[in-house]
Amino acid sequence: MSFKIASFNVNSIKMRLPNVLSWLDKNNIDVILMQETKTMDDNFPSLDFKQKRYNVIFNGQKSYNGVAIASKFEINEITRSLPFYNENIDEDNQARFLHVKINDVNIICLYLPNGNPAPGPKYDYKISWMKRLTKYTVRRFIQLIL
């Protein structure tokens, strides 16, 4: 089975929702990966997607980051966060990652850290996050769409 996947940095789902929904209609997208949704899970406009017959899953955060996936097919959640892999961090509250399975296809929606300025704590976080992502994808032994 084939299906059309698209990625869209929405830079605030509240501000871009009409554009996103219109774009989905015009392009007959089956699965959309959205980054920078910038909203908490409770405020994500899931009903708007459901009215268009999309299943939706999201990992939100107030004002920053946030990722979401809308699909015409069933979505099976795998995880919303990367393991730490002894990267000298205790927690990661940034909503940047969502791994799902749709029609037996593993799909990861992610919003990579910027890391500016370098050197500095944001840069260190980015490097650590990228190492964790690399370990996660390599250890899966499966094909992934990122």
What are the language-model segments listed below?
Residues 114-126:
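Active-site-proximal segments of metal-dependent phosphoesterases and phosphodiesterases across multiple
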Residues 1-54, 64-67, 95:
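N-terminal, active-site-proximal structural segment of metallo-dependent hydrolase catalytic domains
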Residues 37-40, 44-117:
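Structured beta-strand-rich core segments of catalytic domains in phosphoester-bond hydrolases
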Residues 123-145:
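A long, amphipathic alpha-helix that forms part
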Residues 7-13, 86-87, 124-127:
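Short, flexible loop segments at the rims of nucleotide/cofactor-binding pockets, characterized by
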Residues 3, 145-146:
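Residue-level recognition of the N-termini of beta-strands and the immediately preceding loop/turn
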Residues 27, 52, 103, 143-144:
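Structured helix-beta-strand junction loops
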